[in-house]
């Protein structure tokens, strides 16, 4: 098999707003995998979520600010924002695999809250046909059915790989980072902002500045 040419880490999300939990997830896996690029993908119209509060343009600007100090090349991918129909991660992974070719390692990064609902995602098991999946787990959470759906736990156990294997193979492996998850809720942040609070411990300073300058998340 031809050797892997490069490693691209993908971080998708609504980022409404992007917060320190997202940044911590990226920081951890950038240090672990040393990818050649971190590609951040703000969601367009996610099929599971109703009514993003900030516009695509505002969310892109906040993401750009939040990830400006990364020790890796960061690119903001607009494909989901530009997609006119409902957004499915499987479609994004197919498109990126087609773009990068068969010999790139593609690593999809996932937060603990996403992992808990992965079995409801469109064609979730086929995501491994196009990428590796690296996920955070909440502090103290074991890989068990109480916290992670049984079929997801089984798939992760069956596919578990080392960081080195993930970095040097194209797709198909899984990695769970225990005790990584930072318990920050975008919903709670929006509620705090609507009350006029400044959640400085939960948001990158540049993101909070942007929110205040553009009067986002006001009732």
From Swiss-Prot:
GO terms for biological process: NAD biosynthetic process. SUPFAM superfamilies: Nucleotidylyl transferase. Pathway: Cofactor biosynthesis; NAD(+) biosynthesis; deamido-NAD(+) from nicotinate D-ribonucleotide: step 1/1. It catalyses: nicotinate beta-D-ribonucleotide + ATP + H(+) = deamido-NAD(+) + diphosphate. It comes from the Bacteria. Signal peptide: none annotated. HAMAP family: NaMN_adenylyltr. Catalyzes the reversible adenylation of nicotinate mononucleotide (NaMN) to nicotinic acid adenine dinucleotide (NaAD). NCBIfam families: nicotinate (nicotinamide) nucleotide adenylyltransferase (TIGR00482), PRK06973.1 (NF005410). This is Probable nicotinate-nucleotide adenylyltransferase. The lineage of its organism: Bacteria, Pseudomonadati, Pseudomonadota, Betaproteobacteria, Burkholderiales.
């Amino acid at each position: 098999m031809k050797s892997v040419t490069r490693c691209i880490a993908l971080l998708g999300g609504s980022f409404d707003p992007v917060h320190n939990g997202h940044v911590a997830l990226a920081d951890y896996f950038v240090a672990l995998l040393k990818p050649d690029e971190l590609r951040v993908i703000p969601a367009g119209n996610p099929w599971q979520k109703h009514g993003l509060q900030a516009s695509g343009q505002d969310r892109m600007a906040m993401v750009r600010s939040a990830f400006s100090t990364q020790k890796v090349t960061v690119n903001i991918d607009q494909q989901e924002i530009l997609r006119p129909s409902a957004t499915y991660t499987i479609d994004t992974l197919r498109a990126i695999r087609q773009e990068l070719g068969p010999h790139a390692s593609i690593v999809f990064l996932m937060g603990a809250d996403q992992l808990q609902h992965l079995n409801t995602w469109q064609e979730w098991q086929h995501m491994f046909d196009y990428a590796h999946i690296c996920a955070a787990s909440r502090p103290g959470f074991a890989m068990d059915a109480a916290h992670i759906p049984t079929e997801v736990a089984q798939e992760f156990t069956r596919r578990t790989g080392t960081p080195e294997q993930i970095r040097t193979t194209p797709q198909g492996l899984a990695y769970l980072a225990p005790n990584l998850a930072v318990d920050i809720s975008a919903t709670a942040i929006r509620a705090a902002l609507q009350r006029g609070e400044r959640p400085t411990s939960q948001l990158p300073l540049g993101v909070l500045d942007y929110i205040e300058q553009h009067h986002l998340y006001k009732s």
